């Protein structure tokens, strides 16, 4: 109680009770736990719609989408371009994949992260989770979300509108920027 904003970074489905509490009590959430959206899905979306409590994504790609949508109507969106670095194996031939080690997977070419998210990123599992998170956080059908491999990680994501305009958020690959924005 009395919080101006809560940074939610609880892993797994355990994030849902705190997410629900914050929203029902009008406490804005800086969402660093994609699990609240992935596990919560339609329930989390309904809470957001019912309470109208602000949810600000901390993840760089989701923060970029949030920024590109500011002042615009989600119904005007043609598609969301969700970027991915492609991870450390993006240029590997299929034959090379059998020799991948955990140590190799933990050497992300762009970001410095914890072990779980680094492995999830190396296998593109993290991008699958981000597709689900994007779907529920922005209330947009998954068919309107396109993953684009962008190894430089300068374009954090973009939104293409039905009128042909594309808005993108660009910046250095530095997590301090989306954290500060939230």
Please annotate each region the language model reported.
Residues 1-182:
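Catalytic, metal-anchored helix/loop core of enzyme active sites in primary metabolism
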